[in-house]
């Protein structure tokens, strides 16, 4: 009873999550969006099944198909089936292909395994499914999966694949096998290399009219022997003896979801001879083959890998002005999970880069993780029917603007505050962008150092600043007064690296003001261009005004 209750709760939670992400579209907009995506997926289906080619990555196809199903659940009573079968498959399978139900996560798998025994895990090889029929010890027929009941006659093609045994003996002499035709790989590491569009490549080779030598680049992984030996160990031994060695090599007994998770993680990182997209857990005990029907296999389930890249909906386009005045564009996303990391924002880059990408709210983009786990955009995989792009701010800012607050300077001014509070500058721990915005909104700073004048009472009464932290914040602000002169100059945005600034041995504001361009040019990593920037910086009226203000506050190095 508890198991069924847990399953029911999972279903209800899943349904709630689906409805929670329904787009806020009018019926007309929903109809148009669904129709456009339906047509695109139909075109991809036709390319895949009729011509053996694919213009889209397998993972993108799968995720956009799931997105279409989600939209249809929101606005239409009956979603379409994805992965349409070939229209001209006419050869009956001796035993139907059942397909495999997908488990959402480890918990769901654990529930499924709880009341079952004699379970085995296999890699979910990424290719195209096939039936191999042996009669009197010879390969009699090979049939594509099709709709599970009927498929294409692939006998001629499969007979040219050297990895498929053409003759067998013993219990296999008159047998029906089901498996996956895959692209042979040498040392494929799924974690690093991803899916490489393997499924579409295999389909392309099998659909071509010419009998190319490239068929020998294919292999076969047998995952089912309907009505075969009762013991899994006997099945594996007979298959290996006949030449289907991969099945025995990559089939392991498991008792619980923890063991499956360990094997799944091992194969995710290991060098394998094929591309995979997860694992399949199956019971050794199967019903008689006459009871096999598409979509009705209760003795096996799949636990797929999380995609290396995820399709994410763009919720909004936002613009940020950095401390140097450069405008950057950020896409706010509907949350997706990448390698256990929740991704809700991705940096697009400059305004020009954003315009080249042509991204608008409502579009679907492919996101992955670059080095150090930083989200990046790989592609725009779908653009909405109605696209409205925000207008970027005027490019009026540079490295010498917005030291003093104004309405037009809001974003660059905040960026300067965030920069000066960072560990490498003044080290104002405990305050980030949100805190600086709260302080500026309440106390209306005149310039980037106005926070030095805040009292403990003012900090305590600032909305958005916890009273328990206000005293600590005031203490850090007060300690900042004792920071070395070079730290304050960095806070003012001097266009030098810390190494160059330290090498200058400048210890006072007056000394710095009298330094020449030739002096700066001699510093490590500082050429003539950077030296001119330093001169422009120290002669800027806002910088001079800030220097005088810090002198009045008796900051070290600025005193007259």
From Swiss-Prot:
GO biological process entries: DNA repair; DNA replication
Annotated InterPro entries: DNA_ligase_AS, DNA_ligase_B, DNA_ligase_CS, DNAligase_adenylation, DNAligase_N, NA-bd_OB-fold, NAD_dep_DNA_ligaseB, NAD_DNA_ligase_OB
Catalytic activity: NAD(+) + (deoxyribonucleotide)n-3'-hydroxyl + 5'-phospho-(deoxyribonucleotide)m = (deoxyribonucleotide)n+m + AMP + beta-nicotinamide D-nucleotide
GO function terms (MF aspect): DNA ligase (NAD+) activity
Ligase in keyword set: yes
Presence of the UniProt keyword NAD in the record: yes
UniProt-annotated catalytic positions: 124 (n6-amp-lysine intermediate)
Keywords recorded for this protein, A-Z: DNA damage, DNA repair, DNA replication, Ligase, NAD
Enzyme Commission numbers on file: 6.5.1.2
Pfam families: DNA_ligase_aden (PF01653), DNA_ligase_OB (PF03120)
Source organism, top-level taxon: Bacteria
Gene3D superfamilies per record: DNA ligase/mRNA capping enzyme (3.30.470.30), Helix hairpin bin (1.10.287.610), Nucleic acid-binding proteins (2.40.50.140)
Transmembrane segments: none
Function, as annotated: Catalyzes the formation of phosphodiester linkages between 5'-phosphoryl and 3'-hydroxyl groups in double-stranded DNA using NAD as a coenzyme and as the energy source for the reaction.
Family the entry assigns: Belongs to the NAD-dependent DNA ligase family. LigB subfamily.
Protein name: DNA ligase B
Species name: Escherichia coli O157:H7
Record lineage: Bacteria, Pseudomonadati, Pseudomonadota, Gammaproteobacteria, Enterobacterales
């Amino acid at each position: 009873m508890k198991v069924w209750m847990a399953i029911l709760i999972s279903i209800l939670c899943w349904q709630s999550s689906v409805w929670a992400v329904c787009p806020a579209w009018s019926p007309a907009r929903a109809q148009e969006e669904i129709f456009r995506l339906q047509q695109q997926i139909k075109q991809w289906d036709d390319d895949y099944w009729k011509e053996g080619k694919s213009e889209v990555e397998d993972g993108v196809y799968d995720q956009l198909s799931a997105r279409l199903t989600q939209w249809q659940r929101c606005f239409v009573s009956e979603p379409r089936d994805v992965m349409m079968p070939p229209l001209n498959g006419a050869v009956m399978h001796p035993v139907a292909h059942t397909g495999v139900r997908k488990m959402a996560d480890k918990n769901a798998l654990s529930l499924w395994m709880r009341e079952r025994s004699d379970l085995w895990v296999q890699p979910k090889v990424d290719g195209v499914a096939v039936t191999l029929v042996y009669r009197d010890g010879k390969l009699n027929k090979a049939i594509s999966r099709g709709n599970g009941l009927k498929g294409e006659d692939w006998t001629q093609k499969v007979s040219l694949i050297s990895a498929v045994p053409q003759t067998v003996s013993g219990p296999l002499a008159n047998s029906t096998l089901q498996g996956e035709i895959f692209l042979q790989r040498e040392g494929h590491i799924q974690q690093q290399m991803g899916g490489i569009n393997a499924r579409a490549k295999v389909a392309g080779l099998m659909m071509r009219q010419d009998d190319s030598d490239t068929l020998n680049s294919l292999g076969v992984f047998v995952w089912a022997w309907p009505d075969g030996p009762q013991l899994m160990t006997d099945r594996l031994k007979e298959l290996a003896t006949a030449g289907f060695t991969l099945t025995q090599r990559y089939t392991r007994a498991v008792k619980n979801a923890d063991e499956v998770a360990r094997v799944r993680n091992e194969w995710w990182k290991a060098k394998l001879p094929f591309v995979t997209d997860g694992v399949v857990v199956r019971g050794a005990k199967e019903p008689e083959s006459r009871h096999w029907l598409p979509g009705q296999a209760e003795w096996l389930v799949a636990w797929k890998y999380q995609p290396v890249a995820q399709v994410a909906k763009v919720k909004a386009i936002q613009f940020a002005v950095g401390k140097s005045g450069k405008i950057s564009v950020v896409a706010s996303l509907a949350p997706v999970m990448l390698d256990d990391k929740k991704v809700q924002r991705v940096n697009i880059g400059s305004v020009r880069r954003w315009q080249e990408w042509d991204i608008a709210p409502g579009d679907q983009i492919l996101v992955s993780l670059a080095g150090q786990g930083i989200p990046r955009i790989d592609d725009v995989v779908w653009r909405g029917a109605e696209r409205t792009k925000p207008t970027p701010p005027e490019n009026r800012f540079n490295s010498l603007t917005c030291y003093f607050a104004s309405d037009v300077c809001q974003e660059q001014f905040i960026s300067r505050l965030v920069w000066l509070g960072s560990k490498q500058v003044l080290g104002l721990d405990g305050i980030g962008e949100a805190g600086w915005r709260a302080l500026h909104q309440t106390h209306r700073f005149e310039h980037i150092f106005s926070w030095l004048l805040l009292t403990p009472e003012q900090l305590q009464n600032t909305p958005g600043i916890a009273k328990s932290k206000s005293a600590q914040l005031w203490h850090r602000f007060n300690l900042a007064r004792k920071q070395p002169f070079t730290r304050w100059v960095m806070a003012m945005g001097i266009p030098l690296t810390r190494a160059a600034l330290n090498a200058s041995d400048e210890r006072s504001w007056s000394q710095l003001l009298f330094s020449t361009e030739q002096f700066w040019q001699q510093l490590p990593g500082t050429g003539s261009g950077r030296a001119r920037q330093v001169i422009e910086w120290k002669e800027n009226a806002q910088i001079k005004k800030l220097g005088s203000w810090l002198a009045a506050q008796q900051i070290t190095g600025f005193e007259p």
